[in-house]
Amino acid sequence: MAGELADKKDRDASPSKEERKRSRTPDRERDRDRDRKSSPSKDRKRHRSRDRRRGGSRSRSRSRSKSAERERRHKERERDKERDRNKKDRDRDKDGHRRDKDRKRSSLSPGRGKDFKSRKDRDSKKDEEDEHGDKKPKAQPLSLEELLAKKKAEEEAEAKPKFLSKAEREAEALKRRQQEVEERQRMLEEERKKRKQFQDLGRKMLEDPQERERRERRERMERETNGNEDEEGRQKIREEKDKSKELHAIKERYLGGIKKRRRTRHLNDRKFVFEWDASEDTSIDYNPLYKERHQVQLLGRGFIAGIDLKQQKREQSRFYGDLMEKRRTLEEKEQEEARLRKLRKKEAKQRWDDRHWSQKKLDEMTDRDWRIFREDYSITTKGGKIPNPIRSWKDSSLPPHILEVIDKCGYKEPTPIQRQAIPIGLQNRDIIGVAETGSGKTAAFLIPLLVWITTLPKIDRIEESDQGPYAIILAPTRELAQQIEEETIKFGKPLGIRTVAVIGGISREDQGFRLRMGCEIVIATPGRLIDVLENRYLVLSRCTYVVLDEADRMIDMGFEPDVQKILEHMPVSNQKPDTDEAEDPEKMLANFESGKHKYRQTVMFTATMPPAVERLARSYLRRPAVVYIGSAGKPHERVEQKVFLMSESEKRKKLLAILEQGFDPPIIIFVNQKKGCDVLAKSLEKMGYNACTLHGGKGQEQREFALSNLKAGAKDILVATDVAGRGIDIQDVSMVVNYDMAKNIEDYIHRIGRTGRAGKSGVAITFLTKEDSAVFYELKQAILESPVSSCPPELANHPDAQHKPGTILTKKRREETIFA
């Protein structure tokens, strides 16, 4: 009874054969059949073990009826075994699915199928070995003593020098080289593949979805027509297409191709834009006979078929004219004659008004004529209520005795600065004149001064001579002061006006004696004038006219404190009011003619307007009228500028080559240092050239002697420093050589301004070195602005000539380099 119960429980606990058969899926059955075919020995072993387990369980179940404890343990054991069996079945199912996948992959790639087959063969061999019991003995691990002995032997072998023959060394080097080449090729190939993958990926991402779908469909159709090709074949086709596209793009880029212009049509365009080009028009005749019509060449007044078209038109117009004349009444004829008369009168008046300003009288000039006049002479003014310029000396309001002196001095026509500055000066207004060197500035401030001094009674001038001069003219250099003195004496001596020059290099006692004798005009340099004022040789009690000539040069030379000190010695009582009254011409003219109670008039002439000059003008000038003449601060349009880049040692050889070209004297050569000036002049004299020097180290007599020799023609070449760069007027200078480039562009402009004066042309040659790179940019701009000069490519393309010194260049985003 107990045995039957145990059998029943065993049947309940263990699944029946039918259930196990039912639970087996067709896949499992198929896998088992395959395994059975591939390894029959494994299948036999599995059946034996299963029968053994079943037989053992039956015998144990019969002997277990004695004890419930043993039954319980048996059930648990059977349950564990069943669980293990189910787990094995599940693993087998998974292996079956995996094998199916491997089979599918092997159909696509033959390499994988081979791997799977070899693995399967290895498994079957292993099973056979297990079955026959031919197991290889396992390798035993080495002992510690063996390891140490082996390591010691290797170290001794490495320590011993090994001799290699030449052939072995060559073979080893060749092998290493081959390995390096292979490694490099492998890396390049990997890099190429990565780049290609990246490009393909980017192309696919940028590709239009519709275009991508179209391309995939086309590739699919090609694969269907060509058979099932592998991935490598498709990749090869794709690479060939990419290469053909790349070749087409290269041909289009370098061999030229017809670029299809994109047709755009705006919404507001009425004209329809067709898709074809004008060159595709098929209506054009290809036959040149019809394409180009024959034109009959006629001689003289010949006409085709005896018909003259012009004659026909004339006869037709005459016919209609006669017809209209017959139909008009007498009143209509008179009305037409009156209309024509009025039209002729209007045209005559228009022609009269449109005359050039030179053909008109002064009272006929209109505002438009004055504008044209200023444009003709490049006169630009700034400031309120500025008077009109003078057209000629006769049209000016100057006294007859002044005009007579002007005529005797040889001034036929006024220069542009004189045309505008003299009328402003006669109104007692402050003036800032910005004009190039050699423009006649001296007469522009002298003539209004002489006009005012001659209006004063001569007795008062003699009695009040101890109160100082009426006017002070300040110049930056002795040479310029002496030149102004010559011009002033030329104008003032016929009028009885005395002039004294207070400059360095001459005895101060002699100058003091001349000042005590009395004078109306003092021409001075700032340093010596302060010395004379502090030693009480001179007072400025009645000084009402101050002229600052070459004001920018004075500021550059450091005379700004001296100029301010001189202006502080002036009386304060005669200063102009800083109101609109200073711009009123009637009040200023009345004050100008009042005699002793005249307001102080300050005149400043400069070639450039740096900030320091503007600051000085704001401090001491009251509502000034600013006059700009031409391109002030720029080189003459008549001076041809030439530039040569060279080293310091090549300068002398180049200078001799230039002098041998036969330029007419006088010639001025500028250097930067006094010592270099003397050395260059001596070397030129040794080579047979007549040269003289002029610099700050020379005494006054030596300077005057050098200038007089050059003007008289006794010397041909003047070697000078920047002392001669400004204000010195030497007639007919044919060439200026900048042996040493000036330190700034303003000094360069004044240097080359010594030539090309009085309407004549000149040549300015400059030697440049690497040390002059600070002025390359401004020099390049000055040469480019000149119509008669050409900039050499060495200077135009030089890196320092591309931007102004001190400017911070910002790179464009496309020029930036990002270091990752």
Curated annotation (Swiss-Prot):
<dbReference type="GO" id="GO:0003724">
    <property type="term" value="F:RNA helicase activity"/>
</dbReference>
<dbReference type="GO" id="GO:0005634">
    <property type="term" value="C:nucleus"/>
</dbReference>
<dbReference type="InterPro" id="IPR014014">
    <property type="entry name" value="RNA_helicase_DEAD_Q_motif"/>
</dbReference>
<dbReference type="GO" id="GO:0062176">
    <property type="term" value="P:R-loop processing"/>
</dbReference>
<dbReference type="GO" id="GO:0071013">
    <property type="term" value="C:catalytic step 2 spliceosome"/>
</dbReference>
<dbReference type="InterPro" id="IPR001650">
    <property type="entry name" value="Helicase_C-like"/>
</dbReference>
<dbReference type="InterPro" id="IPR027417">
    <property type="entry name" value="P-loop_NTPase"/>
</dbReference>
<dbReference type="GO" id="GO:0005682">
    <property type="term" value="C:U5 snRNP"/>
</dbReference>
<feature type="modified residue" description="Phosphoserine">
    <location>
        <position position="109"/>
    </location>
</feature>
<feature type="compositionally biased region" description="Basic residues">
    <location>
        <begin position="43"/>
        <end position="65"/>
    </location>
</feature>
<dbReference type="Pfam" id="PF00271">
    <property type="entry name" value="Helicase_C"/>
</dbReference>
<keyword id="KW-0508">mRNA splicing</keyword>
<dbReference type="GO" id="GO:0016887">
    <property type="term" value="F:ATP hydrolysis activity"/>
</dbReference>
<keyword id="KW-0597">Phosphoprotein</keyword>
<dbReference type="GO" id="GO:0008380">
    <property type="term" value="P:RNA splicing"/>
</dbReference>
<dbReference type="InterPro" id="IPR011545">
    <property type="entry name" value="DEAD/DEAH_box_helicase_dom"/>
</dbReference>
<feature type="modified residue" description="Phosphoserine">
    <location>
        <position position="14"/>
    </location>
</feature>
<feature type="domain" description="Helicase C-terminal">
    <location>
        <begin position="651"/>
        <end position="799"/>
    </location>
</feature>
<feature type="compositionally biased region" description="Basic and acidic residues">
    <location>
        <begin position="1"/>
        <end position="42"/>
    </location>
</feature>
<comment type="subunit">
    <text>The phosphorylated form (by SRPK2) is a component of the U4/U6-U5 tri-snRNP complex composed of the U4, U6 and U5 snRNAs and at least PRPF3, PRPF4, PRPF6, PRPF8, PRPF31, SNRNP200, TXNL4A, WDR57, SNRNP40, DDX23, CD2BP2, PPIH, SNU13, EFTUD2, SART1 and USP39. Identified in the spliceosome C complex. Interacts with ERBB4. Interacts with ERCC6.</text>
</comment>
<dbReference type="GO" id="GO:0005730">
    <property type="term" value="C:nucleolus"/>
</dbReference>
<keyword id="KW-0747">Spliceosome</keyword>
<keyword id="KW-0507">mRNA processing</keyword>
<keyword id="KW-0378">Hydrolase</keyword>
<feature type="binding site">
    <location>
        <begin position="435"/>
        <end position="442"/>
    </location>
    <ligand>
        <name>ATP</name>
    </ligand>
</feature>
<dbReference type="InterPro" id="IPR014001">
    <property type="entry name" value="Helicase_ATP-bd"/>
</dbReference>
<dbReference type="InterPro" id="IPR000629">
    <property type="entry name" value="RNA-helicase_DEAD-box_CS"/>
</dbReference>
<dbReference type="GO" id="GO:0005524">
    <property type="term" value="F:ATP binding"/>
</dbReference>
<dbReference type="GO" id="GO:0003723">
    <property type="term" value="F:RNA binding"/>
</dbReference>
<feature type="short sequence motif" description="DEAD box">
    <location>
        <begin position="549"/>
        <end position="552"/>
    </location>
</feature>
<feature type="region of interest" description="Disordered">
    <location>
        <begin position="1"/>
        <end position="244"/>
    </location>
</feature>
<dbReference type="Pfam" id="PF00270">
    <property type="entry name" value="DEAD"/>
</dbReference>
<dbReference type="GO" id="GO:0000375">
    <property type="term" value="P:RNA splicing, via transesterification reactions"/>
</dbReference>
<feature type="modified residue" description="Phosphoserine">
    <location>
        <position position="16"/>
    </location>
</feature>
<dbReference type="GO" id="GO:0000354">
    <property type="term" value="P:cis assembly of pre-catalytic spliceosome"/>
</dbReference>
<feature type="cross-link" description="Glycyl lysine isopeptide (Lys-Gly) (interchain with G-Cter in SUMO2)">
    <location>
        <position position="686"/>
    </location>
</feature>
<protein>
    <recommendedName>
        <fullName>Probable ATP-dependent RNA helicase DDX23</fullName>
        <ecNumber>3.6.4.13</ecNumber>
    </recommendedName>
</protein>
<feature type="compositionally biased region" description="Basic and acidic residues">
    <location>
        <begin position="112"/>
        <end position="137"/>
    </location>
</feature>
<dbReference type="GO" id="GO:0046540">
    <property type="term" value="C:U4/U6 x U5 tri-snRNP complex"/>
</dbReference>
<dbReference type="Pfam" id="PF25430">
    <property type="entry name" value="DDX23"/>
</dbReference>
<feature type="compositionally biased region" description="Basic and acidic residues">
    <location>
        <begin position="233"/>
        <end position="244"/>
    </location>
</feature>
<keyword id="KW-0832">Ubl conjugation</keyword>
